[in-house]
């Protein structure tokens, strides 16, 4: 909609109008470091807002995917809430190995005053048998996913044991 495509401050809209405002932030290689999406209902989505939520294109400083790093509401100072996502990332600049990127945890809620988070959902993975590892290339870069989701645990932060654990497989 405005600004120079791919640079900090550029403003975008969705192809089918949703009345969301998308703003590019910072710079990483040949594009933005992150994006902020503000929706008409007051939610603010941050993509690539943390190092672990940026998926790099091989050894390049250019990002090939921006994962959701935070969701927050637009409430006034001191009253807003947020959900924070963290990732296991083997596609970070300077440490590109398998090119894989997978969710590690989701923490919630965090308030605008910094209180919390109080709860966390943790994701645990195991290594797949070598014969079952999907391998491919994306934009000329190796992408192997040797991991499979093994367990999901819901935790009160600071508690010794999870509230609930789901074993998969």
Task: Specify the residue positions occupied by each region the protein language model found.
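Conserved catalytic cores of ATP-dependent inositol ring kinases
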Residues: 1-169
């Amino acid at each position: 909609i405005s600004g120079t495509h791919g640079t900090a401050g550029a403003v975008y809209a969705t192809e089918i109008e949703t009345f969301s405002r998308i703003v590019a932030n910072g710079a990483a290689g040949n594009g933005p470091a992150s994006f902020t999406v503000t929706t008409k209902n007051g939610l603010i989505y941050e993509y690539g807002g943390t190092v672990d939520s940026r998926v790099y294109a091989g050894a390049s400083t250019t990002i090939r995917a921006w994962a959701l790093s935070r969701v927050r509401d637009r409430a006034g100072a001191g009253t807003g809430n947020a959900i924070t996502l963290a990732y296991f990332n083997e596609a970070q600049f300077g440490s590109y190995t398998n090119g894989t990127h997978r969710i590690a945890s989701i923490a919630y809620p965090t308030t605008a005053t910094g209180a919390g988070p109080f709860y966390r959902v943790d994701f645990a993975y195991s290594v797949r048998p070598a014969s079952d590892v999907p391998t491919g290339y994306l934009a000329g870069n190796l992408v192997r996913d040797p991991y499979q989701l093994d367990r999901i645990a819901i935790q009160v932060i600071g508690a010794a044991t999870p509230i609930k654990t789901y074993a998969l497989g």
